[in-house]
Amino acid sequence: MKSKQNATTTYGKVTTAEDIGQIIRAKRKETGVRQDMAAGMSEVGTKFLSQIENGKETAELGKTLRVLRKLGLNVYIYPRSADPLKG
């Protein structure tokens, strides 16, 4: 994952479900939110949140995006030719 750091969470190019899970877990822990609290505010089950944090490949996209939003994270999609992280 090509990345930028912000405090203790690494953000950047995501290529796998595991990358997304690592970012979600790091952001949740950085903000001091327990897994059950994050699941509740995202309206998903704790088991679901645990699965995406562990990189489950088949996690439902809509729920995953909701978790990201509730944690204050955005998703941007760029064509490879316009990748803002290329350097």
Located regions from the model:
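DNA major-groove recognition helix of helix-turn-helix/homeodomain DNA-binding modules
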Residues: 62-78
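Basic nucleic-acid-binding interfaces
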Residues: 29
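Residue-level signal for the short linker/turn that defines the boundary of a DNA-recognition helix
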Residues: 22, 32-33, 59
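N-terminal flexible/basic segments that precede or flank functional cores
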Residues: 1-19, 80-87
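Alpha-helical coiled-coil heptad-repeat segments used for dimerization/assembly
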Residues: 19-22, 26, 37
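Short alpha-helical DNA-recognition segment
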Residues: 32-50
